[in-house]
Amino acid sequence: RVRITNTKELIDEIKDMIVYTGYVCDKDIPKHDTKNNHVYVSCGLNKEEVLLIFKQILKVAEKFPDLQFVMTMANSYMEKLSNVKKGNVILTDYIPQLSKKMANCKLLIAYGGYNTTMEILQGECPAIIIPRQNGQKVEQFVRAYAFEPLDVFKVCNPNELRTLPKIIESAIKDESFPKPFKYSMNGVENSAKEILNYVT
């Protein structure tokens, strides 16, 4: 790793060359329109924290019997469980075409990775982000709390999973949630224009 000692000088040198182009996302993602009671829980595989989330989802599901929770779980964990369906919680190792299912679901609960976050914002899908904050995933934590005041999604701190029922209730009862994301989502187009302007 190279440590830059003249950070301020470097920033001053290149600041006029930096152009904000907007966020990059799939523009074909349809706008959300609730058509079922499914709550998709997509919080990664083969990670210790997914077990903590799973245990919390089992408790949460009892409080929301009218919702159908569908949660991804690694095969290695599923083999240890006696059933793949527990009450109104379905476990699966994969949710095919999740980005399309987001368009009609009641709610999405997910980590705050860049692609998932952009799909949520583009489709205006009601969602709860549980941002990872360990290792090199601190960007999820920073982004989630930077966007939270915009009310484009709810945030549940991974260290405060006990608050998840309250957050879910708030998300599904607030008819004005989520708010539209008002910042540019045209990052691809704008980047292409800037590159063409630079090379021509």
Stretches found by the model and what they are:
Residues 1-20:
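Active-site-proximal region of nucleotide-activated glycan assembly enzymes
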Residues 5-8, 78-81, 116, 136-144:
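Short, glycine/polar-rich helix-capping loops at beta-to-alpha or helix-loop-helix junctions
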Residues 19-21, 90-93, 153-160:
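Short acidic-hydrophobic, aromatic-tinged amphipathic segments that line or gate anion-handling sites
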Residues 22-107:
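Donor-nucleotide binding loops and adjacent catalytic segments primarily
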Residues 96-100, 115-116, 163, 167, ...:
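Short acidic active-site motifs
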Residues 97-141:
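A donor-sugar binding/catalytic signature common to diverse glycosyltransferases
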Residues 123-169:
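Nucleotide-sugar donor-binding patch of glycosyltransferase catalytic domains
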Residues 166-200:
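C-terminal amphipathic helix plus adjacent low-complexity
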